[in-house]
């Protein structure tokens, strides 16, 4: 009886430790449901129904492995990816890495900020500029939580992730997708046309985000409590749960677009405004409002995450620190310039995804090299199977993004 109590007590303590260590992956997972994903998934679902759902499944599995490697690097070495690159690469290479990472962080933030502004415009009936002002105020308020430490921010970001997931459960109820066709689309690969290949590349490009690769290693490098193996075990659970939620949201986005648009003949729906306006008569005003609210939640949370990622790359690569509010102010400026110039916001979203594709391999290659180094990683070094899988992902992601870039350049 005494032994049972001791085991029960130790089991509760282990669960408590694991729970305390969870949270960083929920911040990273927000990068996988930003407005760029909304635009790409809606276009894919409207154009090809359920046929590209399998791409979301595989992209999410790849993203899970990448985020586990990023988190593991921080746990094993106590340094984030940007700091490891700074320590191991020549100075000119480090400066190149910093410049491209900053450009990518700003391009990401541009898409996320404008996405949230579009959401405010749709649900409140304000102008895009007024939506941008509301987005700026809201992100400043969320970033103020950072003063209280990482945990409060994790809770708010995690709450927004769960809100978006709940919103898409509601959208699925409204749209009532064909479950048999949905299941088939998730497991049977299909690329019926060259446009489908291009959209599949876009889905993958919008899913794997370089800025959260840098960020996740930073969020785990200062984790305390439990042994190193316990921290790694908790992190695997953290990533599995958070990325499963993000994967569900992406699947639900595409499935809703398929059920609501593709099978009603609206196969040309390609932007967020059009999706909102088309949802109202097809499903209901409530469905359109839920869509708008989910876009706001995803945009706000992902633009906060983008700001944090920008801070990490600056501190990691060049050891320079600026206050978060200064960075937030500077990175908002391109969004306001785009809006004031009257540029097409959906086109800007697509262009930002193309810019992101340049940074994916630049983040993935050193991540795989460092996490495969036994001197750096010790007992957390990558296994042979993980190394092989990792390099296959790198080759696949690079190939698909080259296809995406060429296709975009040719105007496909």
From Swiss-Prot:
What GO cellular component is one of the record's annotations? Answer: plasma membrane
Topological region Periplasmic: 40-51, 119-125, 176-196, 259-276, 345-350, 407-412
> What's the protein's topology in the membrane?
Multi-pass membrane protein
The encoding gene is mntH
Biological process terms from the Gene Ontology for this record are: iron ion transmembrane transport
- Coarsely, its chief localization is membrane
The residues that cross the membrane are 20-39, 52-71, 96-118, 126-145, 156-175, 197-220, 239-258, 277-297, 328-344, 351-370, 388-406
The similarity comment for this entry is:
Belongs to the NRAMP family.
Keyword Oxidoreductase listed? The answer is no
The UniProt GO MF terms for this protein read: cadmium ion transmembrane transporter activity; manganese ion transmembrane transporter activity; metal ion binding; symporter activity
| Functional note | H(+)-stimulated, divalent metal cation uptake system.
Q: What is this protein called?
A: Divalent metal cation transporter MntH
Q: What is the lineage of its organism?
A: Bacteria, Pseudomonadati, Pseudomonadota, Gammaproteobacteria, Enterobacterales
Q: Which species is the source of this protein?
A: Escherichia coli O9:H4 (strain HS)
Subcellular compartments: Cell inner membrane
